[in-house]
Amino acid sequence: MKEILNALYHQKDLNDEEVKKLFTLIIHEKVSPVQLGAILCALKIKGESFKEISVAATTLLEHAPKPFNSGLDLIDNCGTGGDGLKTINISTIAALIASSMGLSMAKHGSRSVSSHSGSADLLENLGVNIEMNPTQLENCFKQTHFGFLFAPLYHQSFKKSAPLRKELFTKTIFNCLGPLINPLRPKIQLLGVYDKSLCKTMALALKALGVKRAMVVNGGGTDEIVLHDITHACELKNNGILEYDLSAKDFDLPPYDLKELQIENAQESTQACLDILENKGKDSHTMVVVANVASLLYLSHKAKDLKEGVSMTLEHLKTKAPYAHLQKIIRLSHA
């Protein structure tokens, strides 16, 4: 531990063996709170490398139980959170709609830290059992193409270190790790990051973890694809990384103001979700979710481009099938 701390104090990247050792110790609670705080802050100041992030994620995954084997190329759109802008739950609503269109969505998430409502909070408020056992999860997934994996059930180190991390008043490597440690190991990911500078780093980490296709995005300071500003994207495709910017025009959608996406409480987010699924949501809410669903369709080769993905999603919403789909998820999650 002393050698690891000294390396970080001198702003040196840890090698694979050191990262694996460090996170194995963290998992087994062999690191004191003072040491953990020092490590997280030193990593933050140095800047976490994609290798440190990917090896840490691999170590955490090796110790996480896998609930079932799907035999499919699963998709996740979990983001880092931490943008502090308190918007509606764009990625969770997008995952519900995408799964109602047949995409195999294995949604990994937790409760809110910086927003009014995290993915787990929203789903729980909608009536979904967020702590499904493996049998319930597999059954729900097989019948709806949607499964929610509540992070604290699979990664105790996240749960136990949460109070300490909250007291640091800063984002740490744990924010980056959240979207990378889905126990079902999805091969396709739409991953939002709280800082544009992380896009390339996280795309490289996904590549190192064996993800086949991905898009890492930061839209106007949010960890989502947005329509009010430019979305910076790093796309993992054919084992290479493409870097580019997206605007509302790329989706053939009008721009909307960020303020229209912001909410005052969790109840507003829940109602916004229900309204969108019933195709009666505010245009500003619906269209930003549609842009994110379109990106999932594009990454999954279900749409040839983003504009086709938008058209497909808008047509699907007219059927109100996503709302009936949610009711089925709620029922099966408690079965």
UniProtKB/Swiss-Prot annotation:
Mg(2+) 2 binds at D223, E224. It catalyses: N-(5-phospho-beta-D-ribosyl)anthranilate + diphosphate = 5-phospho-alpha-D-ribose 1-diphosphate + anthranilate. It comes from the Bacteria. GO terms for cellular component: cytosol. Pfam families: Glycos_trans_3N, Glycos_transf_3. Its EC number is 2.4.2.18. 5-phospho-alpha-D-ribose 1-diphosphate binds at residues 79, 82-83, 87, 89-92, 107-115, 119. Keywords: Amino-acid biosynthesis, Aromatic amino acid biosynthesis, Glycosyltransferase, Magnesium, Metal-binding, Transferase, Tryptophan biosynthesis. InterPro entries: Anthranilate_Pribosyl_Tfrase (IPR005940), Glycosyl_Trfase_fam3 (IPR000312), Glycosyl_Trfase_fam3_N_dom (IPR017459), Glycosyl_Trfase_fam3_N_dom_sf (IPR036320), Nuc_phospho_transferase (IPR035902). Mg(2+) 1 binds at S91, E224. Its cofactor is Mg(2+). One of its GO terms (molecular function) is magnesium ion binding. Binds 2 magnesium ions per monomer. Anthranilate 2 binds at R165. GO terms for biological process: L-tryptophan biosynthetic process. HAMAP family: TrpD. Catalyzes the transfer of the phosphoribosyl group of 5-phosphorylribose-1-pyrophosphate (PRPP) to anthranilate to yield N-(5'-phosphoribosyl)-anthranilate (PRA). Belongs to the anthranilate phosphoribosyltransferase family. Homodimer. This is Anthranilate phosphoribosyltransferase.
